[in-house]
Amino acid sequence: METDEQADYSLTHVHILSPAGSERMGKPMGHYITLESEKLKENDADCHEKLIGLLAEQIRSLAKPKREDCILVIGLGNWNITPDALGPKVISKILVTRHLSGTLPVEIEKAVRPVAAVSPGVMGITGIETGEIVKGIVDKLHPSLLIAIDALAARRSNRINAAIQMSDTGVAPGAGVGNRRMLLDEAHLGIPVIAIGVPTVVDAATLVNDTMDCILEEMIRQTEKGTAFYETLADLEQEEKYQMIAEILGPYTGNLFVTPKEVDAVVDRLANIIA
């Protein structure tokens, strides 16, 4: 793991290189990048320009297609629900160029990469599995790379709208809200897949878990080291604690997710940055 801490942002690279590491982390083997910045939530044009350049560098580090290779960008999510509309909003702001092939002067065409983009919607709108739509488009267009953009569910409340996560392992649409669909990855689509996501919601169990963490940290600080109570507090596993909270809250809150009240403006800013 490599972390670069700066005044306005932090950038973390995680490489999972072995099956043992994959099992321990609960993620497929691959390269994971997280760009965190509170400035993502704010209307700070100068900082956003810096973050756009940084984000572009990270995307290039995950895949290096040739200039003539076509890239397909997929905006996942339900455009009728603001926290889930990140993908479709990004697609609406992308400059698509695949249809311009052969119509531009040679000098300009050499500098323009063919890009196609689509928002396939969700199965509740189309009646079609998102993965089936994407697979059909890939089989027809034969792009060299797919970039999938999706809204995520945060596992830490301080990451809501403040982190852009990237990986070269693909994406499972709907997994964050317990509605896992067909995987969009190289094994299913036959081409490399870069996933880009932003946590825009958090579930009730995570909010309670984060609150308990703050309480436990304070209790540990005030408890004499070496006592049985101290050891009990220190030995609590994060994942076990989260699962216990989720099970307790389940009958009362159901599938409850929360998003900040300013989500409309923030999702628009995030879409501009990613696009």
Tell where the protein language model's regions lie, with residue ranges:
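A structural-propensity feature for long, helix-poor, extended segments
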Residues: I108-V138
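An N-terminal, well-structured beta->alpha segment
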Residues: G21-A63
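Conserved active-site and cofactor/substrate-binding residues in soluble primary-metabolism enzymes
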Residues: G30, D46, K50, L54, ...
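A structural signal for small-residue-enriched, beta-sheet-centric alpha/beta enzyme cores
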Residues: V118-S119, A148-A275
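Gly/Ser/Thr-rich loops at beta-strand to alpha-helix junctions
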Residues: L76-D84, G124, A151-R155
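Proline-aspartate-enriched helix->loop->beta-strand connector
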Residues: V138, P143-S144
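N-terminal amphipathic/basic leader segments beginning at the initiator methionine
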Residues: M1-M29
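Glycine-rich phosphate/diphosphate-binding loop of Rossmann-like nucleotide-binding domains
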Residues: I74, N78-R113, A117
